[in-house]
Curated annotation (Swiss-Prot):
Ranges annotated as spanning the membrane: 29-52, 61-82, 104-123, 144-161, 200-222, 240-262, 276-295
Annotated family: Belongs to the G-protein coupled receptor 1 family.
PROSITE patterns linked: G_PROTEIN_RECEP_F1_1, G_PROTEIN_RECEP_F1_2
Segments in the Extracellular topological domain: 1-28, 83-103, 162-199, 263-275
Membrane topology: Multi-pass membrane protein
Keywords: Cell membrane, Disulfide bond, G-protein coupled receptor, Glycoprotein, Membrane, Olfaction, Receptor, Sensory transduction, Transducer, Transmembrane, Transmembrane helix
Gene name in the database record: OR3A4P
UniProt-listed InterPro entries: GPCR_Rhodpsn (IPR000276), GPCR_Rhodpsn_7TM (IPR017452), Olfact_rcpt (IPR000725)
Protein known as: Putative olfactory receptor 3A4
UniProt function note: Odorant receptor.
Organism: Homo sapiens (Human)
Residues listed as glycosylation sites in the UniProt record: N8
Amino acid sequence: MDLGNSGNDSVVTKFVLLGLTETAALQPILFVIFLLAYVTTIGGTLSILAAILMETKLHSPMYFFLGNLSLPDVGCVSVTVPAMLSHFISNDRSIPYKACLSELFFFHLLAGADCFLLTIMAYDRYLAICQSLTYSSRMSWGIQQALVGMSCVFSFTNALTQTVALSPLNFCGPNVINHFYCDLPQPFQLSCSSVHLNGQLLFVAAAFMGVAPLVLITVSYAHVAAAVLRIRSAEGRKKAFSTCSSHLTVVGIFYGTGVFSYTRLGSVESSDKDKGIGILNTVISPMLNPLIYWTSLLDVGCISHCSSDAGVSPGPPVQSSLCCLQFTALLSPPPGWGGLSPLNSHGL
């Protein structure tokens, strides 16, 4: 245990992450597996972004939000996996206290953005299918940017609040965390200070960023399902369902793992179940998301060929913002991105 002295108390200056396993024979195998998972996630996500930028059929609000959703997926896996890989090939599994706080902040920042963007995408599907006549005015370019900006502000506020609330806690006993990355509520179990306020803040965050978005997503898709079932055309029903099925799959994986993780606040100690759920939440889910959305893109025939349609007036440059990060396409301004191109008159 690495301790520093402050007066008569021993203060923890580092934590020790036990990681996935302490079995030396398994570590090289796990290193290769998670390295491949990391490369697959980065490659798949960049492919999705490239397709959205270059294919005019994808210049609709739904894929604008998908492009923004891809960024926190890359961020989440980049916050956790590289450090885990280094632990597989190093005997030093310690992490400085401040580095632990930084990891926790960025993870909650990116995971929070995921929560809000998934909710926005459900609302977008509701407008596109249930309010199609007014969709273009209700989901204008300005509104798209405002929604993404709000998701950044809310997720940043929550991440900063949780991190600032954790920083004054005293850790004067064991410093071993039975996990492979720093996240709540594991540090609570090691604190020799009261964590009552921290528990309340985490509960409020879970309600605001977990329960409320999940309720909104459920209500949105209840209306969508009712509207789709009223469509007489089999092709129309298939197209509507295809634009929603991939998103519902991602929502199920994301919230399924998140609910399990943050309902274990009362557990006495971390278990291997927490590590398994952590792997699903931080590695498997971001890796599957590009594969799921690629399947959806293929289903709607958006990736099979480059659009050859002409005569569409150019809109604003392709811009995507997430948590104050923006990228601008090094291409000519795409047709119709400001609202909807003729190929996406109903956001589909």
